[in-house]
A protein has these predicted regions:
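Positively charged, small/polar-rich N-terminal and surface patches that mediate targeting and assembly
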Residues: 2-105
């Protein structure tokens, strides 16, 4: 096979959102699919926030070249608020980041 018979694309950034399957999550998936041309989804049971009963989660993974960490933190916080969650985790280039509401004392 010669080099002219195929093309190669490299994506610098990998973002993985851990989204609980609650009311509104499908709309989030649709918005991400429209914004980013390629993504993958994996469903799993999550045991977070000290809970014994599992919660259904979807990991949405996006590969792109046009985002930075601060943009993703803002996007994750908007997502957390729209899904009415106390916290939301995401990975940016293999670094796990937890976005949570501030606790008032």
């Amino acid at each position: 096979m010669t080099q002219g018979e195929y093309s190669v694309q490299t994506f610098r950034d990998s973002v993985k959102f851990y989204v609980p399957r609650v009311e509104g999550y499908l709309e989030t998936v649709r918005e991400m699919a429209a914004k980013y041309s390629g993504m993958s989804m994996i469903e799993f049971d999550g045991y977070f926030e000290g809970r014994f009963e599992p919660v259904k989660y979807t990991r949405i993974e996006i590969h792109t070249n046009d985002v930075d960490e601060a943009q993703m933190m803002e996007a994750a916080n908007r997502l957390r608020l729209s899904l009415k969650q106390e916290s939301l985790a995401f990975e940016f280039n293999n670094k796990l980041i937890l976005i949570a509401e501030k606790k008032s004392h």
